[in-house]
Amino acid sequence: MASTEGANNMPKQVEVRMHDSHLGSEEPKHRHLGLRLCDKLGKNLLLTLTVFGVILGAVCGGLLRLASPIHPDVVMLIAFPGDILMRMLKMLILPLIISSLITGLSGLDAKASGRLGTRAMVYYMSTTIIAAVLGVILVLAIHPGNPKLKKQLGPGKKNDEVSSLDAFLDLIRNLFPENLVQACFQQIQTVTKKVLVAPPPDEEANATSAVVSLLNETVTEVPEETKMVIKKGLEFKDGMNVLGLIGFFIAFGIAMGKMGDQAKLMVDFFNILNEIVMKLVIMIMWYSPLGIACLICGKIIAIKDLEVVARQLGMYMVTVIIGLIIHGGIFLPLIYFVVTRKNPFSFFAGIFQAWITALGTASSAGTLPVTFRCLEENLGIDKRVTRFVLPVGATINMDGTALYEAVAAIFIAQMNGVVLDGGQIVTVSLTATLASVGAASIPSAGLVTMLLILTAVGLPTEDISLLVAVDWLLDRMRTSVNVVGDSFGAGIVYHLSKSELDTIDSQHRVHEDIEMTKTQSIYDDMKNHRESNSNQCVYAAHNSVIVDECKVTLAANGKSADCSVEEEPWKREK
């Protein structure tokens, strides 16, 4: 009877299961395309809001330009939320660089750190040279410069000449800061000053004539032979010395990694600090859509004569933009695919949030917290790689800047009717590469390093001011390419170093297992020792006395050796 009931119930159970599975499989097919799109956008809500903020800022800025002249205070208020965003991002740069470098390098041995650094530097220098050469080829092929533009744009502002030797020495000086606290907000720079120097007098004035001249209030006129002499000196300029901080904390992290368990407390501290900073990054990123929209809108409104500038420097802008698109959209993904054999476009989708943020903020260092989050959470790249490669890359890997500087230098030469020979073109390429390495990761740093290139090939430095009108757009685009280059570099270095990182992880696991075994063994020994001590008695009676029943009395100090045995009162001999 039971078997008959089981046989009758079996088809019902099977029928119900088939019915449930049928409903589950057919439901997604009938879902509307709009609902699926909304679900997709909901999962990437922050990215969607950021893209919407960029579009909204550009549209609102263009519409407000059509209105009557806007008061500067109104423009300032429109851009104010964007200014707050930049301040918050820059606020996190210092703790993020410190914590990321130390935590990343402390988990690696010296050999692994050296290999990671070597691979990163080879990638950085290779892509920067490729970008500079691409810029030279495009500007020579398109030839955007025309001597007639010089008459339309007018004369530029005179700039102080910069020596390549001084710039190189300043780079080395900043790499070794004399005061670590001062390096957080200042960096050293060689400054040239023009000083009036009078020739030495023919006759030395004695003390009497000097006193008489003072009593008579005689005014000595400056002799006509006075000469203008240029003197050099070192001065501290405002701005974080990122290069010096990176150099120090790289050494600090490697030294702490060599200490092993002795530095575990410090490693835990910086790990917690890094996690706290990343939590703050997530909070700030939900504010970024509004800040980026206000930044772009305010910048577009503040531009004067946008149409005239676009007409005069349109071909120059097109040359730079084409070069950035080719380098960031073709060359970098191609290098990533050749090395890793992985889809570069899915990788780019993972860093799209960082790319949009760089486009809005125009700062590689300001985008650094977002880049960390994209690579570690979206793409699953090892934190030891990102925390070492990204801070260094944000400082010295400037592919977009190298391309921009090469194009701008040759454009200025074409605008002045100067024909550069092969040697000068090579000089422009090499100088653009080296100057981009020394450029600080701050907005419009390319205009500062441009002085080095123009001085190296003997071009007028005052023409740099003519390019400032369009730098607001090109700065954002080259910064976004810089961030993309840093991200692809982290992915390539992680792919090449994955086996070594796995080996280090396995060694750490073996070490942890050994430590756990030792700890368990010590714990078991202590437990057995306590159990044996609790059962141990030290008999004070004579060997010939046999005690049938006894009571163990522990001494006040709790030691087993102080135990005594005494008979119960009713068992004692009378």
From Swiss-Prot:
One of its GO terms (molecular function) is monoatomic anion transmembrane transporter activity. Pfam families: SDF. GO terms for biological process: adult behavior; cellular response to cocaine; chemical synaptic transmission; D-aspartate import across plasma membrane; glutathione biosynthetic process; L-aspartate import across plasma membrane; L-aspartate transmembrane transport; L-glutamate import across plasma membrane. This is Excitatory amino acid transporter 2. Glycosylated. Palmitoylation at Cys-38 is not required for correct subcellular localization, but is important for glutamate uptake activity. It is linked to Developmental and epileptic encephalopathy 41: A form of epileptic encephalopathy, a heterogeneous group of severe early-onset epilepsies characterized by refractory seizures, neurodevelopmental impairment, and poor prognosis. Development is normal prior to seizure onset, after which cognitive and motor delays become apparent. DEE41 inheritance is autosomal dominant. Na(+) 1 binds at residues 393, 397, 482, 486. Belongs to the dicarboxylate/amino acid:cation symporter (DAACS) (TC 2.A.23) family. SLC1A2 subfamily. SUPFAM superfamilies: Proton glutamate symport protein (SSF118215). Keywords: Amino-acid transport, Cell membrane, Chloride, Disease variant, Epilepsy, Glycoprotein, Lipoprotein, Membrane, Metal-binding, Palmitate, Phosphoprotein, Potassium, Sodium, Symport, Transmembrane, Transmembrane helix, Transport. Homotrimer. Isoform 3 can oligomerize with isoform 1. Interacts with AJUBA. Residues 345-375, 425-458 dip into the membrane without crossing it. Residues 1-44, 109-120, 260-268, 340-344, 376-384, 494-574 are cytoplasmic. It comes from Homo sapiens. The chain crosses the membrane at residues 45-64, 88-108, 121-142, 236-259, 269-296, 318-339, 385-411, 472-493. The lineage of its organism: Eukaryota, Metazoa, Chordata, Craniata, Vertebrata. The gene is SLC1A2. The modification Phosphotyrosine is found at residue 539.
